[in-house]
C-alpha cells in the first residue's frame, strides 16, 4: 500500500503521519505542495496537520490555492481516498471536499491534550476496524477546531451517516472541548472516500506515549 502525504509551508505533522503508516507496513512518500500531480500509485492521500501558510487569513484558507490542491480535488472526485487530519481537515473544508467549516475554539485558547472520542459510524474504510460506540483516546492539538455547519447541513450529515466521531468522556458521555456543533470531531463526504477529523490518530500509535488507539483507526485503510 502506498500513502502519499502532502507538505505545505508550515505543515508539521507529515513525519508523524509517515511514521504511523510505516509502522503499519505501508510505503510512504511526502509530496511538496508545488506538485501538480498525485503519484499514480497512491492508495491513500494524507493532508497532514500543522499550520499551512502560518494559518494566515483562516486555517487552510491559503493552502487551498496551492498547485497540488487541484490534483487533490481531481483525485478525490475520481474516487481516491483522502484523509485530512487537523489542519488537513481545515484545508479539505476550505477546498469544498468536506462540508462545514472550522472556527476558533470556544475558549479562544490553543488546546493540546488527549481527549476521548466515540465512534458514531463505522460503515466506512476509515473506522471499519472499530465498532459503533467504541471509545478511543486520541490527542488533540488545535486553536481552530470548533466545527460548524448550518442546520440544513447538519441534518444532511446525519441523514447520510457522515458524522463519524464525537468528543466524549471516558464513559462515552458528551464532553466538548472546543464548542464544535453536536460535539462533532470527524466527518466524511457522501461518497465515503474523503475523511476529516481534528484529533491526531497518527500521534496515538504507541501506548508508551499515552495511547495506541490510533492503530485501529488507521488500519482500515490498509486494505485500500
Curated annotation (Swiss-Prot):
It holds the Pfam family GATase_5. Residues 2-224 form the Glutamine amidotransferase type-1 domain. The active site is at 86 (nucleophile), 200, 202. Keywords: ATP-binding, Cytoplasm, Glutamine amidotransferase, Hydrolase, Ligase, Nucleotide-binding, Purine biosynthesis. One of its GO terms (biological process) is 'de novo' IMP biosynthetic process. The keyword Aminoacyl-tRNA synthetase does not apply. GO terms for molecular function: ATP binding; glutaminase activity; phosphoribosylformylglycinamidine synthase activity. The keyword Ligase applies. Its EC number is 6.3.5.3, 3.5.1.2. Its main location: cytoplasm. GO terms for cellular component: cytoplasm. Signal peptide: none annotated. Part of the FGAM synthase complex composed of 1 PurL, 1 PurQ and 2 PurS subunits. Part of the phosphoribosylformylglycinamidine synthase complex involved in the purines biosynthetic pathway. Catalyzes the ATP-dependent conversion of formylglycinamide ribonucleotide (FGAR) and glutamine to yield formylglycinamidine ribonucleotide (FGAM) and glutamate. The FGAM synthase complex is composed of three subunits. PurQ produces an ammonia molecule by converting glutamine to glutamate. PurL transfers the ammonia molecule to FGAR to form FGAM in an ATP-dependent manner. HAMAP family: PurQ (MF_00421). This is Phosphoribosylformylglycinamidine synthase subunit PurQ. It comes from Sulfurimonas denitrificans (strain ATCC 33889 / DSM 1251) (Thiomicrospira denitrificans (strain ATCC 33889 / DSM 1251)).
Amino acid at each position: 500500500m502506498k500513502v502519499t502525504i502532502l507538505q505545505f509551508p508550515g505543515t508539521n505533522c507529515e513525519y508523524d503521519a509517515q511514521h504511523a503508516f510505516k509502522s503499519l507496513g505501508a510505503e510512504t512518500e511526502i509530496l511538496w505542495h508545488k506538485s501538480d500531480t498525485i503519484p499514480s500509485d497512491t492508495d491513500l492521500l494524507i493532508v497532514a496537520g500543522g499550520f499551512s501558510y502560518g494559518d494566515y487569513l483562516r486555517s487552510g484558507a491559503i493552502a487551498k490555492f496551492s498547485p497540488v490542491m487541484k490534483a487533490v480535488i481531481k483525485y478525490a472526485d475520481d474516487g481516491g481516498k483522502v484523509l485530512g487530519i487537523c489542519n488537513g481537515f481545515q484545508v479539505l473544508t476550505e477546498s469544498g471536499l468536506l462540508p462545514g467549516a472550522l472556527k476558533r475554539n470556544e475558549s479562544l485558547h490553543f488546546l493540546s491534550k488527549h481527549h476521548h472520542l466515540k465512534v458514531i459510524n463505522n460503515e466506512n474504510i476509515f473506522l471499519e476496524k472499530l465498532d459503533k460506540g467504541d471509545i478511543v483516546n486520541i490527542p488533540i492539538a488545535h486553536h481552530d477546531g470548533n466545527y460548524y455547519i448550518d442546520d440544513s447541513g447538519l441534518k444532511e450529515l446525519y441523514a447520510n451517516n457522515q458524522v463519524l466521531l464525537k468528543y466524549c468522556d471516558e464513559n462515552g458521555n458528551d464532553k466538548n472541548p472546543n464548542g464544535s456543533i453536536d460535539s462533532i470531531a470527524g466527518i466524511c463526504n457522501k461518497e465515503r472516500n474523503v475523511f476529516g477529523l481534528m484529533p491526531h490518530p497518527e500521534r496515538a500509535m504507541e501506548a508508551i506515549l499515552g495511547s495506541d488507539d490510533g492503530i485501529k483507526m488507521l488500519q482500515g485503510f490498509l486494505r485500500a
